[in-house]
């Protein structure tokens, strides 16, 4: 768990951090639709960013058709595109 967080924090962009986190959660849940155990504030803290920046990035990703989100629930619509953003 700690090494996963360190790997996330080494990524440069917030979008890459969000993509890596959501892809790892999808893998852990064996589904592209899942609920995370964090609020937006807790997730922002986990990713070491401001809550407002996280909310803005998630809104942009939703607008771009990459995912759907409501509170702590997510549906990854374009997992291959998300994987590409982590590289």
Show the residue positions of the predicted features.
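A small-molecule sensor/coupling module
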Residues: 1-16
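Short acidic/polar alpha-helix capping motifs at helix-coil junctions
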Residues: 5-7, 21, 46
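Pre-recognition alpha-helix immediately N-terminal to the DNA-recognition helix
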Residues: 17-24
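Phosphate-/nucleic-acid-contacting segments
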Residues: 25-87
């Amino acid at each position: 768990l700690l090494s996963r967080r360190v790997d996330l924090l080494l990524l440069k962009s917030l979008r890459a951090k969000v993509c890596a986190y959501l892809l790892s959660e999808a893998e852990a849940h064996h589904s592209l639709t899942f609920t995370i155990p964090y609020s937006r504030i807790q997730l922002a803290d986990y990713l070491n960013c401001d809550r407002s920046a996280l909310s803005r990035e998630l809104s942009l990703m939703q607008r771009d058709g990459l995912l759907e989100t409501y509170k702590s629930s997510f549906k990854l619509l374009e997992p291959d595109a998300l994987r590409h953003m982590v590289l």
